[in-house]
């Protein structure tokens, strides 16, 4: 069964459909040696050869590809990019290796923000979850420094003007602290760059700590170490798919046996420890990555 080329490439994680359409229009995609045109359809078969900028890429039939989703505890100091020219650690460094697929980040967190970051092998799922029209809730725990009064909280709820347009928190809830150091839990339904920090700064308050604790109804897993990941089970994966009107999966690669879960947890802890040691050695090796 043939499918639109941009749909096949989006599913394989090579960008959103709109991004891929631009790549196709620029003549950067070829199918079996011929430059592709927007609107082309392909049938995914073992002999199909699709190249982007001359590089052969791997694609699979929709029925063959199992949608996988990871919940990752991003530490502060990691970049949301696949490769950094300065050799700084990235969120992809510790993820499990894949064959015939790749992990796609669902949105981004800035370098000084930690917490929940979802990854998936399904490009269409990632793009829909990120799109503002879906209004998927993101919840953050925020420690702020500065005087917070009722007027400022009203402004943050009703909306303030940022350089890229108006913005507001959907909910704001005080969660502890005294004096000018206080914690709040806030929610947004979009993911603009540094939006949480910029909203608080717009009312004269600085953010000193920022942790994403929930994406949709998926919380940051309890007990997950910083730099650790866990794979969502079938029910959680299908919750996310239903949330953005994608058909459910019927199978999962998550092991259900307790012994295998325990083994995986131990492997994650060892990977976190090993990566921390490597990162520490990299930073002390004479290259200054703090600039």
From Swiss-Prot:
Q: Name one GO biological process term.
A: enzyme-directed rRNA pseudouridine synthesis
The chain positions of domain S4 RNA-binding read: 3-75
Q: Which InterPro entries match?
A: PsdUridine_synth_cat_dom_sf, PsdUridine_synth_RsuA/RluA, PsdUridine_synth_RsuA/RluB/E/F, PsdUridine_synth_RsuA/RluB_CS, RsuA_PseudoU_synthase, S4_RNA-bd, S4_RNA-bd_sf
This entry's Gene Ontology molecular function terms read: 23S rRNA pseudouridine(2605) synthase activity; RNA binding; rRNA pseudouridine synthase activity
Ranges where the record places region Disordered: 256-291
Q: Name one GO cellular component term.
A: cytosol
Task: Name the Enzyme Commission number(s) assigned to this protein.
Answer: 5.4.99.22
Could you tell me the keywords of this UniProt record? Isomerase, RNA-binding, rRNA processing
Annotated active site residues, numbered on this chain, are 110 (nucleophile)
Any matching Pfam family:
S4
Record field: catalytic activity: uridine(2605) in 23S rRNA = pseudouridine(2605) in 23S rRNA
Q: Indicate whether tRNA-binding appears among the record's keywords.
A: no
Enzyme class, broadest EC rank: isomerase
Q: Does the keyword rRNA processing apply?
A: yes
Assigned protein family: Belongs to the pseudouridine synthase RsuA family.
Q: What does this protein do?
A: Responsible for synthesis of pseudouridine from uracil-2605 in 23S ribosomal RNA.
UniProt-listed NCBIfam families: PRK10700.1, pseudouridine synthase
Specify the protein name.
Answer: Ribosomal large subunit pseudouridine synthase B
- Name the gene for this chain: rluB
């Amino acid at each position: 069964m043939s499918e639109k080329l941009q749909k096949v490439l989006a599913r394989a994680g090579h960008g959103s459909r709109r991004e891929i359409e631009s790549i196709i229009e620029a003549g950067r995609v070829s199918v079996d040696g011929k430059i592709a045109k927007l609107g082309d359809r392909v049938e995914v078969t073992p002999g199909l050869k699709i190249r982007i900028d001359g590089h052969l890429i791997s694609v699979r039939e929709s029925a063959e590809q199992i949608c996988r989703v990871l919940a990752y505890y991003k530490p502060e100091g990691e970049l949301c990019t696949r490769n950094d020219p300065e050799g700084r650690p990235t969120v992809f460094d510790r993820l499990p290796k894949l064959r015939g697929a790749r992990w796609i980040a669902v949105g981004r967190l800035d370098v000084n923000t930690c917490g929940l970051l979802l990854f998936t092998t399904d490009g269409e799922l990632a793009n829909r979850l990120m799109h503002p029209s879906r209004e998927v809730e993101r919840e953050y725990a925020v420690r702020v420094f500065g005087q917070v009064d009722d007027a400022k909280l009203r402004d943050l709820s009703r909306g303030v003007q940022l350089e890229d347009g108006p913005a507001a928190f959907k909910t704001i809830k005080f969660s502890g602290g005294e004096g000018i150091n206080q914690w709040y839990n806030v929610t947004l339904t979009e993911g603009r760059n540094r939006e949480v920090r910029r909203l608080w700064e717009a009312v004269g308050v600085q953010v000193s700590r920022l942790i994403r604790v929930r994406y949709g109804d998926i919380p940051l897993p309890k007990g997950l170490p910083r730099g650790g990941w866990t794979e969502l089970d079938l029910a959680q994966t299908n919750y996310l798919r239903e949330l953005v009107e994608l058909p459910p999966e019927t199978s999962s690669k998550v092991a259900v046996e307790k012994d295998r879960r325990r083994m995986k947890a131990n492997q994650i802890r060892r990977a976190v420890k090993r990566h921390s040691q490597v990162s520490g050695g990299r930073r002390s090796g004479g290259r200054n990555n703090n600039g």
